[in-house]
Amino acid sequence: MKASMFLALAGLVLLFVVCYASESEEKEFPRELISKIFTVDDFKGEERECKGFGKSCVPGKNECCSGYACNSRDKWCKVLLGK
């Protein structure tokens, strides 16, 4: 009788350990997925980053932020006037 109680208790402890390990892996998966999504968004933000006032630019490439235009003479972003 003592042996069967010991085996039952050991089985419950083993079940608890297995459940705890699988639950902790499930909790980490969404965190990893979210962090990968945000790193992809950060990368896209770097690709589409616009240039602000006074930054050098290439005329005709539309690199300046909205409200600014690349000046062909000076080759830097200036405030867009009259359009």
Swiss-Prot record:
Residues carrying Leucine amide: L81
Leader sequence segment: 1-21
Any one cellular-component term (Gene Ontology): extracellular region
Tissue: Expressed by the venom gland.
Propeptide: 22-48
Entry's localization field: Secreted
Mutagenesis or variant effect for K51L: No gain of activity against hNav1.7/SCN9A
Name of one Pfam family that matches: Toxin_12
InterPro entries: Huwentoxin-1, Huwentoxin_CS1
Molecular function per GO: ion channel inhibitor activity; sodium channel regulator activity; toxin activity
Main location, first listed in the record: secreted
Disulfide bonds: C50-C65, C57-C70, C64-C77
Keyword line: Amidation, Disulfide bond, Ion channel impairing toxin, Knottin, Neurotoxin, Secreted, Signal, Toxin, Voltage-gated sodium channel impairing toxin
Similarity section: Belongs to the neurotoxin 10 (Hwtx-1) family. 14 (Hntx-1) subfamily.
Domain comment (free text): The presence of a 'disulfide through disulfide knot' structurally defines this protein as a knottin.
Task of the protein: Weakly blocks the rat SCN2A/SCN1B (Nav1.2/beta-1) sodium channel (IC(50)=68 uM) and the insect sodium channel para/tipE (IC(50)=4.3 uM), without altering the activation or inactivation kinetics (depressant toxin).
Other remarks on this protein: Negative results: has no effect on mammalian SCN3A/SCN1B (Nav1.3/beta-1), SCN4A (Nav1.4), SCN5A/SCN1B (Nav1.5/beta-1), and SCN9A/SCN1B (Nav1.7/beta-1). Has also no effect on sodium subtypes in rat DRG neurons containing Nav1.1/SCN1A, Nav1.6/SCN8A, Nav1.7/SCN9A, Nav1.8/SCN10A and Nav1.9/SCN11A.
Quaternary organization: Monomer.
Protein name, per record: Mu-theraphotoxin-Hhn2b 2
